[in-house]
């Protein structure tokens, strides 16, 4: 008889629950959150494993790949979907959640989540590191400007590190007591700037060497970071039957509420991959605001901005870009200007 397991994962321990085909609990337990330990625990208590279910979370990719490599038929499901079932219980606890996940594994009433491979997660880590460096650099630069303004000093348009150092030396000449106070901030800012630039160069190099990214970058407004983000987020274009589905995956489609005679559409869901959504929005903004060469997509977006507003136009163009990039990737073709 096939047995079904639910894994409620926390940072140090994982609660397990085993149910049979009738939903009767066969065993409960807890073990360390480690693929080897979990696999051995499952083998010790289950002879015939039908399906093992765990929720999405910080450790889900690590556990999924570790269990799959050890021959465990593991499935990862969306935590937001599982919450609707697990929240029906009056009392919330880790053992109860493991039991609920085991029942979901038995019934098959869930939507499986695609787990990216290690190479893709490495690319996403590179993108995240660059994003954090850019944000930290911007915040520190604004902090420096704000502190100088407290004393009536203005940094001005110091666009390069050399110009900023030159300008700061002039300002410290006016208020010498500020130099000792602000030197740690200035030094940290320079280090962040160097690391951010190095990270951007590495991403550009990798994007230029990647055939898929090079093809995606033929689309106006799509740069190396946008292309790498799209590739690392979608990973496999065959996951989506239509290009329009990528926009929904990125959370760029409006929410819908239909009941009886009422059928309304709200704001975009923002329920998908936030990194991909931001990259598509940035590419759309670049296409509408910075690209000078005319094309059909740009004309359509600018016309929409005249009637619906700039923000809605950017979102609409971002949806179009998602479908376009997916099509170019799937068909292995480059962008043709029209």
Region annotations inferred by a language model:
Residues 1-338:
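A detector of single, family-specific signature residues
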């Amino acid at each position: 008889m096939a047995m079904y397991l639910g894994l409620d994962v926390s940072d140090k321990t994982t609660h397990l629950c085993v149910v049979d085909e009738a939903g009767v609990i066969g065993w409960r337990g807890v073990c360390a959150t480690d693929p080897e330990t979990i696999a051995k625990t499952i083998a010790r208590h289950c002879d015939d494993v039908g399906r093992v279910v765990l929720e999405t979370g910080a450790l889900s990719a690590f556990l999924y790949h570790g269990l799959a490599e050890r021959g465990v038929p593991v499935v990862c499901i969306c935590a937001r979907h599982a919450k609707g079932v697990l929240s029906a219980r009056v009392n919330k606890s880790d053992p109860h959640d493991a039991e609920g996940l085991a029942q979901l594994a038995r019934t098959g009433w869930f939507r499986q989540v695609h787990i990216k491979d290690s190479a893709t997660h490495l690319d996403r880590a590179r993108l995240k590191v660059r994003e954090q460096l850019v944000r930290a650099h911007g915040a520190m630069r604004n902090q420096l400007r704000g502190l100088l303004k407290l004393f009536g000093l203005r940094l001005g348009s110091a666009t390069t590190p050399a110009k900023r150092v030159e300008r700061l030396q002039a300002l410290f000449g006016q208020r010498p007591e500020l130099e000792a106070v602000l030197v740690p901030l200035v030094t940290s800012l320079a280090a962040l700037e160097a690391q951010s630039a190095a990270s951007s160069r590495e991403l550009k190099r990798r994007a230029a060497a990647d055939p898929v990214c090079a093809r995606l970058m033929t689309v106006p407004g799509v740069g190396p970071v946008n292309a790498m983000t799209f590739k690392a987020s979608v990973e496999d274009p065959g996951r989506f039957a239509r290009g329009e589905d990528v926009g929904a995956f990125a959370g760029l489609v409006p929410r819908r509420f239909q009941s009886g005679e009422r059928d309304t559409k709200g704001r975009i869901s923002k329920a998908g991959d936030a990194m991909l959504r931001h990259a598509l929005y940035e590419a759309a903004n670049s296409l509408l605001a910075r690209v000078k060469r005319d094309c059909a997509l740009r004309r359509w977006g600018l016309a929409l901005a005249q009637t619906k507003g700039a923000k809605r136009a950017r979102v609409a163009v971002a949806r179009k870009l998602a479908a376009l990039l997916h099509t170019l990737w799937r068909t292995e073709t480059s962008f043709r200007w029209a």
